[in-house]
């Protein structure tokens, strides 16, 4: 059985750890509110933008933008991998890296070259360890922090230029979709060429939920579409970053809450062990006293 001093030191150490996990839980909770507010505020804009873009795509002529045209054969793919810069958030980064690794293996089986654009240190560090993983660009200090739309514009322009120049035939993004405080789902979506945008077959005339507005285009649908397609890429990247940031804070909040609970359980176990050790020490002292008294009598 460990000594009383050893148990006391262990209890003190666990209590210090609990203070840290509790503080990190509170910080993550605070950041989560802000990130979730930004994400939910941006969703209606992204949905309306997709609606207008789909309407324009349906009206556009036969001369289609190169951002919409799939390549005849896919030989090179770029993947935008969104992870966090820091750990201590449970399996958040592990799930994203696992999806990226699975996608990399599928592409290698088809003899497709894969390169990565990184948001976050965890994804970048994983790619550094892979001998067959080419890194294009990296953006650190973005996910989980305060960032503006200009970050998505910078990354989006680089991806669009690479796609138009033939550096890669497709661009995909892997990010964490926020589905609730206890559920963050890693997903992969195609950015380029821009996949077909679903629109309602026929606009409803009653103005209900399925109502699709008739968009009047000036100067022409083709010209407006050419201007909106790059912005659609920026919006998809920005939305992925918002979702990933919110998911990171939610995952860290849950991980630190579980860690604090584990600290409480450990403190209870160590306290019980301390009481047993203390009781054993007191019993031993009493036995010595009684033994000494009996020896004096004898």
Swiss-Prot record:
Keyword Cell inner membrane: yes
GO biological process, one term: proton motive force-driven plasma membrane ATP synthesis
MF GO annotations: ATP binding; proton-transporting ATP synthase activity, rotational mechanism
Organism of derivation: Desulfosudis oleivorans (strain DSM 6200 / JCM 39069 / Hxd3) (Desulfococcus oleovorans)
Upper lineage: Bacteria, Pseudomonadati, Thermodesulfobacteriota, Desulfobacteria, Desulfobacterales
Keyword Ion transport assigned: yes
Protein name: ATP synthase gamma chain
Membrane topology field: Peripheral membrane protein
General function of this protein: Produces ATP from ADP in the presence of a proton gradient across the membrane. The gamma chain is believed to be important in regulating ATPase activity and the flow of protons through the CF(0) complex.
Predominant subcellular localization, coarse grouping: membrane
Subcellular location: Cell inner membrane
Database matches in InterPro entries: ATP_synth_F1_ATPase_gsu (IPR035968), ATP_synth_F1_gsu (IPR000131), ATP_synth_F1_gsu_CS (IPR023632)
Pfam families named among the record's database cross-references: ATP-synt
Record SUPFAM superfamilies: ATP synthase (F1-ATPase), gamma subunit
Family according to the record: Belongs to the ATPase gamma chain family.
One cellular component term from this protein's GO annotations in UniProt: plasma membrane
Keywords: ATP synthesis, Cell inner membrane, Cell membrane, CF(1), Hydrogen ion transport, Ion transport, Membrane, Transport
Top-level taxon of the source organism: Bacteria
């Amino acid at each position: 059985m460990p000594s009383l001093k050893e148990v006391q030191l262990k209890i003190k150490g666990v209590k210090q750890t609990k203070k840290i996990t509790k503080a990190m839980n509170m910080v993550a909770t605070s950041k989560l509110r802000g990130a979730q507010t930004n994400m939910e505020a941006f969703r209606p804009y992204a949905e309306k933008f997709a609606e207008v873009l789909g309407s324009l795509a349906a009206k556009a002529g036969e001369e289609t933008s190169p951002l919409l045209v799939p390549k005849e054969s896919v030989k090179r793919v770029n993947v935008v991998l969104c992870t966090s810069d820091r750990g201590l958030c449970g399996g958040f980064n592990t799930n994203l890296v696992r999806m990226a690794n699975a996608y990399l293996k599928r592409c290698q089986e088809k003899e497709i070259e894969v390169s990565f654009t990184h948001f976050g240190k965890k994804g970048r560090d994983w790619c550094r360890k892979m001998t067959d993983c080419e890194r294009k660009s990296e953006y650190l200090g973005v996910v989980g922090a305060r960032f503006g739309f200009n970050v998505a514009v910078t990354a989006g322009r680089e991806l669009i230029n690479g796609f138009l120049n033939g550096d890669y035939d497709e661009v995909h993004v892997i990010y964490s979709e926020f589905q609730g405080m206890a559920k963050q789902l890693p997903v992969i979506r195609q950015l380029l060429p821009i996949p077909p945008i679903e629109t309602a077959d026929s606009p409803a005339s009653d103005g209900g939920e399925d109502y699709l507005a008739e968009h009047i285009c000036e100067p022409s649908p083709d010209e407006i579409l050419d201007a909106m397609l790059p912005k659609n890429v920026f919006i998809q990247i920005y939305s992925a970053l918002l979702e990933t940031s919110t998911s990171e804070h939610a995952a860290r909040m849950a991980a630190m809450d579980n860690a604090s609970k584990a600290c409480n359980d450990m403190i209870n176990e160590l306290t019980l062990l301390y009481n047993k050790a203390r009781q054993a020490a007191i019993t031993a002292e009493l036995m010595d006293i009684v033994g000494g008294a009996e020896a004096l009598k004898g």
